Amino acid sequence: WIMGHMVNSLAQMDEFVGLGSNSIETDVSFDKQANPEYTYHGVPCDCGRSCGHSTKFNDFLKGLRKATTPGDSKYHEKLILVVFDLKTGSLYDNQAYDAGTKLAKNLLQHYWNNGNNGGRAYIILSIPKLNHYKLITGFKETLKNEGHEDLLEKVGHDFSGNDDISEVQKTYNKAGVTGHVWQSDGITNCLLRGLSRVKAAVANRDSGRGIINKVYYWTVDKRSTTRDSLDAKVDGIMTNYPDITVEILNEDAYKTKFRIATYEDNPWETFKE
């Protein structure tokens, strides 16, 4: 999965898919009442990027729906996975459940079209703080209450705070999550970070005893880091330059070992070599 980083406008979505992304990461900011408000990152952000792109969340969802609905004039067949980077740091811990509820209602109406031929992409809810795990509970219970529990088949999870993996596992136990787990690891492209935690996450994924199904590394912009990430056997690379990821995947060392995921690849299934 080649995950276009910080895609917060519909024009950027077209741009990143055009460069080779089959997945995008979108930042979601919340208002004081825990309503998802804008797709917006703000300052500071990755080096070499403009931090200010912003779209009303529901408008973004409508555009995303068109981009992921076969037959629509705006349809991108390649775009199969969306990571919502939920900026819940602005919320009190006790608002996490409400944020999950409101997020589910927004997605149900504007992305899934109330279950009537909505967008087909898989969705990852990426939460920065472990103690906001009730967002997951609120999200799930809302879809169940609305009669659309089936849509949870399209939803996965990530905690993005680089916490200890055993703590992440405990938090998922509390949230009642048993699958559909991606584990992120990374840092802004302005700084360097080693691969030790990525390797620990991959080991958890491959042990058959852990909760992790997939691992992605962010933000990977350099050719050398891209190769290191692939050598560590990650499932996803989040990048500002998807064309570089495509270029490296075409190198002799990688083209027989890796391929770009399609809609037929289940993002919640651990790949077995």
From Swiss-Prot:
Q: Which cofactor does it need?
A: Mg(2+)
Q: What is the name of this protein?
A: Dermonecrotic toxin LvSicTox-alphaIC1ai
| Pfam families with a match to the protein in the record | GDPD_2
Q: What class of enzyme is it?
A: lyase
Q: Which GO terms describe its biological process?
A: killing of cells of another organism; lipid catabolic process
What does the record give under GO molecular function?
lyase activity; metal ion binding; phosphoric diester hydrolase activity; toxin activity
To which protein family does this belong? Belongs to the arthropod phospholipase D family. Class II subfamily.
Say what the protein does: Dermonecrotic toxins cleave the phosphodiester linkage between the phosphate and headgroup of certain phospholipids (sphingolipid and lysolipid substrates), forming an alcohol (often choline) and a cyclic phosphate. This toxin acts on sphingomyelin (SM). It may also act on ceramide phosphoethanolamine (CPE), lysophosphatidylcholine (LPC) and lysophosphatidylethanolamine (LPE), but not on lysophosphatidylserine (LPS), and lysophosphatidylglycerol (LPG). It acts by transphosphatidylation, releasing exclusively cyclic phosphate products as second products.
User: How and how many cofactors are bound, per the record note?
Assistant: Binds 1 Mg(2+) ion per subunit.
Record organism:
Loxosceles variegata (Recluse spider)
Q: In which tissues is it expressed?
A: Expressed by the venom gland.
Q: Which GO terms describe its cellular component?
A: extracellular region
Q: Which domain of life is it from?
A: Eukaryota
Q: Which residues bind Mg(2+)?
A: 25, 27, 85
Indicate whether Disulfide bond appears among the record's keywords.
yes
